[in-house]
Regions:
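Active-site neighborhoods and metal-handling regions in enzymes and metal-associated proteins
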Residues: 1-320
Length: 320
């Protein structure tokens, strides 16, 4: 964790920001610290603090070694964690505070401003700290992806005509947890037949029929890092029209993969795949982006691969 605290402090120095408040579970996971709702991280240019309430103090003392643990007791003081943040900011003479905009309530924002502290919304900047992965992160994700592939192979062995989408989803969940996943990366998507046209189709009681497409889209978290796999399978031979579309999508995916290289922009990769689908006459149905980053990912991850993305790809970025 010390390496990532240092990375944040280097960022604060570079941007001339006095402190950074971290509330999101994603960034707390990235820092390998406590992730509970009563655990907040405050990093200044010189120190790092883990602010916890009484529910987390015992666990914090057992697990936390790089951040100074500070207990706040809202039941005695009548104030939330911002009372402790205020004390630290005053002690270290901080005048500017970076925050994650999507995590800080309007009321909290106003409380901080009343202290005379300039509040800076730094969502993109904080995300950028994580966008290029370290070697150990990549290894964790490779393991996560390998486990995901094994789970998929186990699931498809059990799929049969008459099985419901709910049952397929239940198998995915079971084999994921049985294989060592901490949790699912996102709600599992299972769609069959005409429902495979729904990119985020949640499972229903619809039953599998022979020769029709079965779409399974799921991922797991392993050592906090996620996988994300989408696969299409069939019982028996698919309808010729469906096979044609499948082959177009596969060709587009391979074109996108070929376009991924350091120096390319996210929109270049999207275009490489989109051109294939448009040339085949299906462009109007490709009404979403090509892909997105992978990582801890609970609140989204860069780089984005869509028709507007100006993100320049770098070595050790991970994406789906």
């Amino acid at each position: 964790m010390a390496k990532r605290i240092n990375k944040i402090q280097e960022f604060l120095d570079e941007k001339d920001i006095d402190a950074l408040l971290i509330k999101s579970k994603t960034v707390k996971k990235w820092m390998n610290t406590m992730t509970g709702s009563g655990c907040q991280v405050l990093i200044t240019k010189e120190h790092g603090y883990l602010i916890v309430d009484g529910r987390y103090i015992t666990e914090a003392k057992e697990k936390e070694h790089d951040l100074e643990i500070i207990l706040h007791n809202p039941h005695l003081t009548g104030r939330n964690y911002l009372g402790t943040v205020e004390e630290i900011l005053k002690k270290e003479n901080c005048k500017t505070l970076g925050v994650e905009a999507y995590q800080v309530l309007v009321k909290e924002y106003q409380e901080i401003e009343k202290l005379g502290i300039e509040v800076l919304l730094l969502d993109q900047e904080i995300a950028h700290l994580r966008i290029v992965k370290e070697d150990e992160e990549i290894e964790a994700m490779k393991k996560s992806i390998a486990i995901t592939d094994e789970i998929y192979q186990k699931v498809i062995e059990h799929i049969h005509v008459g099985m419901s989408e709910y049952e397929i989803s239940a198998l995915v969940q079971y084999y994921s947890i049985a294989s060592g996943a901490q949790q699912m990366s996102f709600d599992t998507i299972v769609a069959t037949g005409e429902r495979t046209a729904l990119p985020h189709g949640r499972p229903t009681s619809r039953k599998v029929k022979a020769h029709e497409p079965i779409m399974i889209d799921f991922g797991i978290q392993y050592q906090n890092y996620q996988s994300d796999m989408t696969r299409m399978c069939f019982i028996g031979e698919p309808d010729p029209k469906i096979k044609e579309i499948y082959d177009v999508v596969l060709k587009a995916q391979l074109a996108g993969l070929s376009a991924i290289k350091a120096g390319a922009k996210g929109k270049d990769v999207d275009k490489a795949a989109r051109d294939v689908i448009e040339a085949a006459g299906y462009g109007e149905y490709f009404n979403h982006g090509l892909g997105h980053g992978l990582g801890i990912g609970e609140d989204g991850e860069g780089p984005t691969l869509n028709s507007k993305s100006e993100t320049v790809l770098q070595e050790h970025m991970m994406m789906s």
